[in-house]
Regions:
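Leloir-type glycosyltransferase catalytic cores
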Residues: 1-26, 144-234
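Short loop/turn segments at strand-loop or loop-helix junctions that form parts
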Residues: 28-40, 73-74, 137
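Functional cation/ligand-contacting sites centered on basic and imidazole/sulfhydryl donors
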Residues: 35, 67-73, 217-220
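C-terminal structured domains
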Residues: 53-58, 84-87, 93, 103-113, ...
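A donor-sugar binding/catalytic signature common to diverse glycosyltransferases
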Residues: 101-146
């Protein structure tokens, strides 16, 4: 997790950094609403209630009246590649709308709290130790690590963040790097992405520890969580 955060990696690993000066000057908390494609399968199949992005923005503003609400619409919707169900302009009076091509890791580092329906960015926010509110049932909700608005009674394990990360990012997937798709450990995959994104200074690469402390891992809890992840429909 420390490598992912230190190297600024995220879901897409593209876009420009989000310096705070690009956001309105403020000493208030910043709460990010992650816009999604509203007819995406992750929402249709992963959320019992039907929320639009604008619904989430309004809920966020109501629950955080003293905070600065920042809304990032999904880039595929902004680009006209996917259908728009709710118009960001309808909530422009209660939030700051980011429509540029911003780097997601930099954006997460710039906020204190993230609201989402099912986006993977919610888990990336957890990795960066941000508070996360979830309205659907993505793989990382229901374990006691997020503010959940949808019950997930089958998820009975209570893993730590380290344990959930181990289950979801180390034990569950297989990693391939290079044009030949060579099998790799997660550390090699992270370094490959970091180098591909913008190069990694040697001193930073050598100064970041990739290992999870052994005392932070409960093997039984990780195994139970991993079984829970395997049962989630893809």
């Amino acid at each position: 997790m420390s490598m992912i955060s230190a190297f600024g990696l995220s879901k897409y690993n593209v876009g420009q950094d989000v310096p705070l000066k690009r956001l309105p000057p403020s000493d208030r908390r910043r709460v990010l609403v992650v816009g999604q494609v509203e007819d995406d399968a992750s929402i249709v199949m992963g959320c019992a209630a039907r929320y639009t992005n604008n619904d989430i923005v309004r809920i966020t503003q109501k629950e955080n009246p003293d905070a600065e609400v920042i809304y990032r619409p999904h880039p595929d919707v902004l680009g006209g590649h996917r259908k728009e169900f709710s118009n960001p302009r309808d909530v422009a009076n209660i939030c700051t709308i980011l429509s540029g091509d911003y780097d997601l890791g930099s954006l997460l580092d710039s906020v204190d709290h993230v609201y989402t329906i099912t986006s993977l960015l919610g888990f990336e926010a957890l990795i960066r130790r941000k508070k996360v509110t979830v309205f659907g049932a993505p793989f990382y909700s229901g374990w006691g690590l997020t503010d959940d608005r949808q019950p997930t009674p089958r998820r009975t394990a209570k893993p730590s963040l380290d344990e959930l990360f181990a289950a979801a990012y180390i034990l569950y997937p297989r990693y391939c790097v290079g044009s030949l798709g060579s099998s790799a450990e997660i550390e090699h995959a992270i370094m490959s992405l970091a180098l591909e994104k913008n190069g990694v200074p040697r001193e930073l690469a050598e100064g970041v520890s990739s290992a999870l402390p052994a005392e932070a891992i409960n093997v039984d809890c990780v195994s139970q969580t991993l079984e829970g992840l395997k049962s989630i429909p893809s």
